[in-house]
């Protein structure tokens, strides 16, 4: 549920390595 300061509209989340995932075009973690 915490925003990772990254969007995933055109490219995947780079922050997935930190546990972030794409949700509603924005990368979130928990």
Curated annotation (Swiss-Prot):
Record keywords, A-Z: Disulfide bond, Knottin, Plant defense
Alphabetical list of InterPro entries matching this protein: Cyclotide, Cyclotide_bracelet_CS, Cyclotide_sf
Record carries keyword Cell membrane: no
Annotated domain remarks: The presence of a 'disulfide through disulfide knot' structurally defines this protein as a knottin.
Keyword Hydrolase: no
GO biological process, one term: defense response
Assigned protein family: Belongs to the cyclotide family. Bracelet subfamily.
PROSITE patterns, alphabetized: CYCLOTIDE, CYCLOTIDE_BRACELET
Task of the protein: Probably participates in a plant defense mechanism.
Stated name of the protein: Cyclotide hyen-F
Tissue-level expression: Detected in seeds (at protein level).
Cross-link (Cyclopeptide (Gly-Asn)): 1-30
Domain of life per record: Eukaryota
Disulphide connectivity of cysteines: 4-20, 8-22, 13-27
Post-translational modification: This is a cyclic peptide.
């Amino acid at each position: 549920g915490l925003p990772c300061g990254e969007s995933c509209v055109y490219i995947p989340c780079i922050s997935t390595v930190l546990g972030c995932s794409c949700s509603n075009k924005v990368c979130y973690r928990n």
